[in-house]
Design a protein with these regions (language model features):
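Conserved beta-strand-loop-alpha-helix hinge in the C-terminal portion
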Residues: 144, 152-164
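ABC family nucleotide-binding domain
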Residues: 1-141, 145
Length: 164
């Protein structure tokens, strides 16, 4: 079904179940723990509490935040908050993830680990990642690189990278 012909409620439902978002400004809820922030999407989807806890714990471990599940965003570094935001976006295994600078505030090793996780999700689950970035490392690892200038596409190139 075409999204431009969908009702608002259907669009909201489609976004909730099919699209993950990584915002450059994180948009974490400061009074919730890292784990509760990650669980939020699944709670809105109606996932049972036990399953939410299990999945959120596992994904936080995958992004390197094991042991920090009970910390609230103000108690985390910028890079840790970024990884909570990524975990929240991918925990429900959406079809598409829209990510604005997902490796901002991360050191190169952590950024590479995160890109490896994205590649794994793409290969195993068919998740498509649409990433806005200035990071050359992400650009090198992408399956397709679309460059914009002043809002216009100036190049659209298939690459040998793995993330797409």
């Amino acid at each position: 079904k075409r999204v431009d012909q969908m009702e608002k409620s259907d669009l909201a439902n489609m976004r909730l179940h099919n699209i993950g978002f990584v915002f450059q400004a994180y948009n974490l809820i400061p009074v919730l723990t890292a784990q509760e922030n990650v669980e939020m999407v699944m709670q809105m989807q109606g996932v049972h509490k036990h399953e939410r806890k299990e999945k959120s714990y596992a994904i936080l471990k995958e992004v390197g935040l094991e042991g920090l599940e009970t910390r609230k965003p103000p108690e985390l570094s910028g890079g840790q908050q970024q990884r909570v935001a990524v975990a929240r976006a991918i925990v429900a295994r959406p079809s598409i993830v829209l990510a604005d600078e997902p490796t901002a505030n991360l050191d190169s090793v952590t950024a590479n680990n995160l890109l490896d996780l994205m590649l794994q999700m793409n290969e195993e689950h068919g998740t498509t990642f649409v990433i806005s970035t200035h990071d050359p490392m992400i650009m090198q690892r992408a399956k397709r690189l679309v460059k914009l200038h002043d809002g216009c596409v100036v190049s659209n190139t298939a690459q040998n990278g793995g993330i797409g």
